[in-house]
């Protein structure tokens, strides 16, 4: 009902948060999803919960209401000494991206990390600008829907470079705006942000 309420309130679209160890991500990840029923095991079963939500929104809100999904394209389990193959890898994310696009998702928002690797989801300031952009670049090669690039995008010039290189179609820069509420205005005026 959340998407229906958003639509009735005039919200332009919805973005499902299927990243960072939250509920939908827990179903998608072989690391957290140890179920043996129709919602666990193979990729189709692990994606079932997300796909049911997508189909439910599409049925309730109609074919023209934009649906996006934010995913952790890589869980980086190796950052904590775990086997990365036990979780979501870039290759697995490519399969999920195709499934989501096939289900009618209009936008793919690419992030990374889960609770166990939270520094890859909410990076400390020491992380290089745009260090996750390679994930978005790769996922963009397997889908025909717009891809959002996030990850410590501090500079408007760097954001523009990513767009010019076709690394992504949109830039997610929420943290830049939290750090500097004038970020977008500075970008428009050619100032350093």
Locate the predicted segments by residue.
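Flavin-dependent oxidoreductase catalytic cores
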Residues: 1-193
